[in-house]
């Protein structure tokens, strides 16, 4: 078997190269080579020996001598120090040396030479060296070390993109008697995961069963880690479920990765479910595991659950550290509970064990900036410096963002300059915070100037930058420039999220470009993005304004398919559209459905529907429609309705509602009275004005 892997010219060396056949006889090599250590460190050659044979003998002697001088540790590969130029050894001579050493001096000596050889580029990717070494070890019955050589080959060949070739050889070695082991196959999975070759790893996993290798806990763990790292959350969930079902328990490090990945993708409840399931299987969570869940709950806004998890952690004997406290402080600040966060912050300040770090201060500064308490934010900014903590880019960006939102651009620019003085360059997030606020304050030219400065510093626009620019162009009704930015964004590699697509769809709708908005809507769906309530409301509102009530109703009914619940604005838009088409009965049904859902109709919706009843001379139903409103809301709605009726010269119905208005509020407002007086005068019905004026003057409702 082995001889077939050797070059023909060297096969006879296995027979003619007389090396003592026991490891003890290595002392013989040491003795006979000691006389030559001061010269060329080579064995004396017989007259019949060729130069190649002499070189092989010399190398074998050097390896044996070096091996005896080393302190060997069973758990680690043996290393030898050979005072020998590897370049003078050919590929064929190298495999002859390793085969000869394995045959005559034992597996460990051969393995020493093997590791020495693959340390050189010349032999590192010479596949036959690995195969001959593994085959030689296999012939000695040393399957464990043969697998070790195969794993070494897998790692080294993966470096040059030849993983698949190496895996093929591992599989082929089964024909030579080396059946793939779970450790070797897990090595393949690990390499594939590190390279991001998840589909390849899945294929290898399937091949394991075919080859009779039973996947173990490490196999599943590697697949779970790979899918999570690659962002394939559903696939990771599937592998993790399979792992749990087989009773395999992840280690603490893997558990942290699982919990963090699930929480970052908004699957906090799923993370908690797995956490509980693993505990049921005997998993012992540590401080980092608990902190990962607490952080996820805080980012979700589930502060109460986060503190309940904290209590459970303490019951399990773990004391919260600065990272646990920082997660809670950050969560409290994001919910607007800054004072509660500050009390927790002070607890850290007074602690003898842990002190607030840069991230803790940054979270508190962000909380105060959110509440426009910039003086307190600045106080903490100074305090952290006094404590010997250096603000990082995120700290500066948080404070700059706070000042920009408050309109304090002078201080924001001052902080940006201070960053540079302290060795921190503002990043694109810093500039985004400034240009976003400038655009919202109608200072777009200044924002563009600042953005050009960012580009001159070598920064590049990210997805947020493009979103800000597109939103500004849509606000200016320059849809062409917005689309130009949108195209550039896609070419740069940034994908538009649903929020940005909503901005563009709304802009198209405002300009009554329904074909474009329809195309963009369909594109969004085809890309796997899920339209939101805002998307549908924009489309429905525009179709209603265009008088295309059928398409508006179609989009309204499709909302459920994407899990979108219409709000009062969605209902209001559709009711207005139905009223324009004189479909009052359908509009009334929608109005009742909106009330049943607990939604409060906008005033314009109430007025529109009541007005449609009045147009049909059905003031009684108009009265019934408005009857459930409380007094204040009723008065405001009826005043608006009276003015609308007056503008349409429907004085008779207006007088009826005006009379009802005076019954609830004897002091008519000037605007409504003026509108009614003008309408009566223009319609020649001054008697109505006289009658109502007398009632107002008497204060009679």
UniProtKB/Swiss-Prot annotation:
It comes from the Eukaryota. Keywords: Repeat. PPR repeats lie at residues 146-180, 181-215, 216-250, 251-285, 286-320, 321-356, 357-391, 392-426, 427-461, 462-496, 497-531, 532-566, 567-601, 602-632, 634-668. The keyword Hydrolase does not apply. Gene3D superfamilies: Tetratricopeptide repeat domain (1.25.40.10). Belongs to the PPR family. P subfamily. NCBIfam families: PPR. This is Pentatricopeptide repeat-containing protein At4g19890.
């Amino acid at each position: 078997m082995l001889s077939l892997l050797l070059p023909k010219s060297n096969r006879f060396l296995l027979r003619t190269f007389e090396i003592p056949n026991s490891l003890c006889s290595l002392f013989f090599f040491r003795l006979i080579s000691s006389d030559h250590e001061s010269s060329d460190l080579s064995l004396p050659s017989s007259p019949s020996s060729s130069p190649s044979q002499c070189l092989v003998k010399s190398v074998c002697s050097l390896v044996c001598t070096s091996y005896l001088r080393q302190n060997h540790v069973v758990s680690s590969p043996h290393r030898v120090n050979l005072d020998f130029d590897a370049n003078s050894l050919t590929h064929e001579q190298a495999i002859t040396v390793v085969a000869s050493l394995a045959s005559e001096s034992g597996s460990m000596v051969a393995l020493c030479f093997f590791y020495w050889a693959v340390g050189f580029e010349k032999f590192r990717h010479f596949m036959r060296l690995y195969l001959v070494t593994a085959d030689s070890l296999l012939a000695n019955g040393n399957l464990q070390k043969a697998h070790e050589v195969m794993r070494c080959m897998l790692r080294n060949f993966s470096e040059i993109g030849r993983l698949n070739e190496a895996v093929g050889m591992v599989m082929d070695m089964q024909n030579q008697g080396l059946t793939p082991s779970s450790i070797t196959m897990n090595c393949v999975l690990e390499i594939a995961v590190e390279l991001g070759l998840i589909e390849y790893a899945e294929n290898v996993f399937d091949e394991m069963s075919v080859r009779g290798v039973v996947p173990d806990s490490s196999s599943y763990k590697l697949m779970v880690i790979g899918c999570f790292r690659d962002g394939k959350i559903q696939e990771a969930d599937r592998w993790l479920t399979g792992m749990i079902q087989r009773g395999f328990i992840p280690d603490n490090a893997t558990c942290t990765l699982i919990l963090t990945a699930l929480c970052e993708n908004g699957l906090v409840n799923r993370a908690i479910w797995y956490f509980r399931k693993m505990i049921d299987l005997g998993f012992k969570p540590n401080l980092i595991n608990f902190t990962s869940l607490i952080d996820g709950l805080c980012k979700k806004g589930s502060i109460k659950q986060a503190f309940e998890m904290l209590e459970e952690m303490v019951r399990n004997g773990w004391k919260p550290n600065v990272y646990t406290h920082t997660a809670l402080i950050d969560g409290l600040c994001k919910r607007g509970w800054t004072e509660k966060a500050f009390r927790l912050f002070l607890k850290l300040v007074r602690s003898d064990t842990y002190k607030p770090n840069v991230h803790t201060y940054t979270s508190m500064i962000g909380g105060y900036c959110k509440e426009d308490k910039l003086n307190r934010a600045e106080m903490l900014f100074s305090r952290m410096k006094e404590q010997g903590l250096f603000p990082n880019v995120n700290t500066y960006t948080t404070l700059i963002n706070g000042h920009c939102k408050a309109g304090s651009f002078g201080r924001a620019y001052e902080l940006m300059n201070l960053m540079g003085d302290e060795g921190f360059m503002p990043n694109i997030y810093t500039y985004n915070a400034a240009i976003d606020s400038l655009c919202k304050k109608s200072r777009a030219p200044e924002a563009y100037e600042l953005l050009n400065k960012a580009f001159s510093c070598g920064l590049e626009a990210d997805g947020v930058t493009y979103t800000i620019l597109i939103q500004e162009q849509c606000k200016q009704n320059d849809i062409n420039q917005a689309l130009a930015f949108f195209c550039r964004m896609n070419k740069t590699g940034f994908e538009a999220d649903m929020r940005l697509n909503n901005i563009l769809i709304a802009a198209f709708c405002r300009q009554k470009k329904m074909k474009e908005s329809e195309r963009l809507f369909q594109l969004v769906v085809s890309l796997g993005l899920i339209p939101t309530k805002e998307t549908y409301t924009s489309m429905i509102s525009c179709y209603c304004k265009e008088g295309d009530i059928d398409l508006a109703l179609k989009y309204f009914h499709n909302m459920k398919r994407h899990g979108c619940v219409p709000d009062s604005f969605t209902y209001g838009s559709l009711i207005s559209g139905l009223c324009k088409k004189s479909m009052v009965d359908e509009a009334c049904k929608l109005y009742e459905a909106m009330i049943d859902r607990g939604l409060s109709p906008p005033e314009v919706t109430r007025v529109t529907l009541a007005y449609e009843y009045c147009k049909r001379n059905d003031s009684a139903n108009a009265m019934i429609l408005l009857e459930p409103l409380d007094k204040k809301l009723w008065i405001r709605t009826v005043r608006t309705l009276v003015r609308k009726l007056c503008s349409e010269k429907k004085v008779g119905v207006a007088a009826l509602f005006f009379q009802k208005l005076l019954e609830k509020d004897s002091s008519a407002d000037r605007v409504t009275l003026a509108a009614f007086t003008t309408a009566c005068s223009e319609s020649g019905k001054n008697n109505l004005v006289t009658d109502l004026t007398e009632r107002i003057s008497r204060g009679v409702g």
